[in-house]
């Protein structure tokens, strides 16, 4: 097809502003789905995506649309995730487009994550078409929200499209606006082939399926292609487009979006954001924008049953294919045995990975509390990055201890300002600015230690603001801090998986609360169990879990006291011996309790 009749666009929207419903509306308006095939959130094909109502993986669909100018257009929708943890996925999807539809809920207005993605789209020089969705709601305020978009985003909203994806209002207007406003791709089919990978996943039958946006040249079935970042060559076995079901083709030309299957078995050969080129005459320069993603949050994942260790490795390998941002390495814990230290983009990402491992691979897992990466300068001048508290050097060897800071942008209704400011102050935050967008909505900017964010910041923000506040964060750098390692000892033995790094000012309080929490969660034993919180050799809190006692004197009716004493002494001896060799089982809830302890 002539590139001038191709349009590539994506939809930017906050969670719950109706992006997936709008995508469903576009599919049915262009006749891509018959009534029999329709189901809600058609593009969210992961069970978890439907259940949580969020888009996790990027998807693509090619729509044929006959415009009012009489021409047939090929419109490629590249669906993007909206959550802050997946911003790299969003940036790759946006790099594959020339335009974006900004969907804003006419009742709720602009949210923090929408803004972050709009700025990404602007950096990629995309044509942005604003759309007010859910216009049929009684609480919709189209004029107010249109003004808010003009003020916060700086887009001209004079001819803003009013739509309701659910009631099928304004869908054709959106399609016409895409044809009219989004520029056709700049495509030269005579050049050396180059294509941008914006997603990939593992299929049990075909191997790796790679989603690409052709930028230059042509790739045909049977061609030898090269992945530039990993320097691997493969032959194209199958290729085509999603309409929305796979439609096989023999060629993909510049400007088009489609999939390529090469029978790739090794997950690590395909990096999202990489460039595909011809193996015979490779391009000299890859496409801009590829970056290896650095995980920001780390946690240990261990199988409950040790024999599941190999299955966990296979499962992580398979997930890594769909999720290039997940990293993992072997970790050995004295308390939990062998497992993996996994790196994630953020907390939602961590939850989703854990849930997918349990759901799709039927694994029973224990996850330790998440930690962030710290930077330590030792007394001998060497630098180290610390991902796991158990690897922390002795305090006398540390010259400088730095922790990562993030810039957090919060959008909230004015009613909840007080609670949110208190939460940020509790979390050692430094206020940067506060700006009223309207008389009912305010933007607050804080600089926060990332360590405080990974604990329970998001949950508490949502409960303080009854779910109305939204947040967006970006990493700003490392700063020196007074941090210590807090150990939890059970019967004098440090449980490595329960160690965490905290600010010295909070250590005493956090240690006491944790010891109390452990006392509630650890089941009582036949002997007394001491639960202690310690910094180095100094014990800062202690709780004692009482023993379960069997009444050994029950069978003595009356009689001599020395008989009873003998039985009690014998019981005491037994308990002492038991305590010496006994092993206390720590339940999964205890590992998660670290997250839920509020200072």
Curated annotation (Swiss-Prot):
Its EC number is 3.6.5.n1. Residues 4-186 form the tr-type G domain. GO terms for molecular function: GTP binding; GTPase activity; ribosome binding; translation elongation factor activity. Required for accurate and efficient protein synthesis under certain stress conditions. May act as a fidelity factor of the translation reaction, by catalyzing a one-codon backward translocation of tRNAs on improperly translocated ribosomes. Back-translocation proceeds from a post-translocation (POST) complex to a pre-translocation (PRE) complex, thus giving elongation factor G a second chance to translocate the tRNAs correctly. Binds to ribosomes in a GTP-dependent manner. It is an enzyme of class 3 (hydrolase). Belongs to the TRAFAC class translation factor GTPase superfamily. Classic translation factor GTPase family. LepA subfamily. The lineage of its organism: Bacteria, Pseudomonadati, Bdellovibrionota, Bdellovibrionia, Bdellovibrionales. It comes from the Bacteria. This is Elongation factor 4. One of its GO terms (cellular component) is plasma membrane. GO terms for biological process: positive regulation of translation. It catalyses: GTP + H2O = GDP + phosphate + H(+). GTP binds at residues 16-21, 133-136. InterPro entries: EF-4, EFG_III/V, EFG_V-like, EFTu-like_2, G_TR_CS, LepA_C_sf, LepA_CTD, LepA_IV. HAMAP family: LepA. Keywords: Cell inner membrane, Cell membrane, GTP-binding, Hydrolase, Membrane, Nucleotide-binding, Protein biosynthesis. The keyword Zinc-finger does not apply. It is a peripheral membrane protein. It is found in: Cell inner membrane. The gene is lepA. SUPFAM superfamilies: EF-G C-terminal domain-like, P-loop containing nucleoside triphosphate hydrolases. It comes from Bdellovibrio bacteriovorus (strain ATCC 15356 / DSM 50701 / NCIMB 9529 / HD100). It holds the Pfam family GTP_EFTU_D2.
């Amino acid at each position: 097809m002539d590139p001038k009749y191709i349009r590539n666009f994506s939809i930017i929207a906050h969670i719950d502003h109706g992006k997936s419903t709008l995508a469903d509306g576009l599919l049915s308006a262009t006749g891509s789905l018959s009534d029999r095939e329709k189901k809600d959130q058609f593009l969210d094909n992961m069970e978890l995506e439907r259940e949580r109502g969020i888009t996790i993986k990027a998807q693509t669909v090619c729509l044929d649309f006959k415009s009012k100018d009489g021409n047939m257009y090929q419109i490629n929708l590249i669906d993007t995730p909206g959550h802050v943890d997946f911003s790299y996925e969003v940036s790759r999807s946006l790099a594959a487009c020339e335009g974006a539809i900004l969907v804003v809920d006419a009742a709720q207005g602009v949210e923090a994550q929408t803004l972050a993605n709009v700025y990404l789209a602007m950096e990629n020089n995309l044509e942005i078409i604003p759309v007010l969705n859910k216009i049929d709601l009684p609480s919709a305020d189209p004029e107010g929200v249109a003004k808010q978009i003009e003020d916060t985003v700086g887009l001209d909203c004079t001819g803003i499209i009013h739509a309701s994806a659910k009631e099928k209002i304004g869908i054709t207007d959106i399609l016409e606006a895409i044809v009219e406003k989004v520029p056709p791709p700049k495509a030269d089919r005579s050049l050396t082939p180059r294509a941008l990978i914006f997603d990939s996943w593992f299929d049990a039958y075909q191997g790796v399926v790679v989603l690409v946006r052709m930028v230059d040249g042509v790739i045909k079935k049977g061609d030898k292609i090269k992945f530039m970042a990993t320097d691997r060559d493969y032959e194209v076995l199958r290729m085509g487009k999603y309409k929305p079901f796979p439609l096989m083709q023999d060629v993909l030309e510049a400007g088009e979006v489609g999939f390529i299957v090469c029978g790739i078995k090794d997950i690590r050969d395909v990096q999202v954001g990489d460039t595909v080129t011809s193996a015979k005459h490779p391009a000299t320069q890859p496409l801009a924008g590829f970056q290896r993603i650095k995980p920001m949050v780390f946690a240990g994942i261990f199988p409950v049953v040790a024999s599941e260790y190999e299955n966990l490795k296979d499962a992580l390998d398979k997930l890594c294919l769909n999720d290039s941002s997940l990293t993992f390495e072997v970790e050995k814990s004295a308390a939990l045995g062998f497992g993996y230290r996994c790196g994630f983009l953020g907390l939602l990402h961590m939850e989703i990975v854990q849930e997918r491992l349990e759901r799709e691979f039927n694994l029973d897992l224990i996850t330790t509390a998440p930690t962030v990466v710290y930077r330590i300068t030792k007394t001998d001048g060497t630098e180290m990055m610390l991902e796991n508290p158990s690897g922390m050097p002795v305090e006398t060897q540390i010259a400088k201890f730095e922790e990562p800071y993030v810039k957090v942008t919060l959008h909230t209704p004015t009613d909840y300002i007080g609670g949110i400011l208190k939460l940020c102050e509790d979390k050692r935050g430094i206020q940067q600015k506060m700006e009223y967008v309207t008389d009912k909505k305010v933007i607050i900017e804080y600089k926060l230690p990332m360590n405080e964010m990974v604990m329970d910041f998001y949950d508490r923000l949502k409960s303080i603001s009854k779910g109305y506040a939204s947040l967006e964060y970006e990493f700003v750098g490392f700063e020196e801090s007074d941090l210590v390692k807090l150990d939890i000892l059970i019967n004098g033995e440090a449980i490595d998986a329960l160690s965490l790094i905290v600010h010295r000012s909070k250590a005493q309080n956090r240690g006491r609360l944790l010891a109390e929490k452990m006392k509630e969660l650890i089941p009582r034993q036949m002997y007394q169990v001491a639960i202690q919180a310690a910094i180095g050799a100094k014990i800062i809190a202690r709780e004692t879990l009482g023993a379960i006692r069997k009444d050994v004197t029950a069978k003595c009716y009356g009689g001599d006291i020395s008989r009873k004493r003998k039985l009690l002494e014998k019981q005491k001896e037994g308990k002492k011996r038991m305590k010496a060799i006994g092993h206390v089982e720590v339940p999964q809830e205890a590992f998660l309790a670290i997250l839920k302890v509020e200072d």
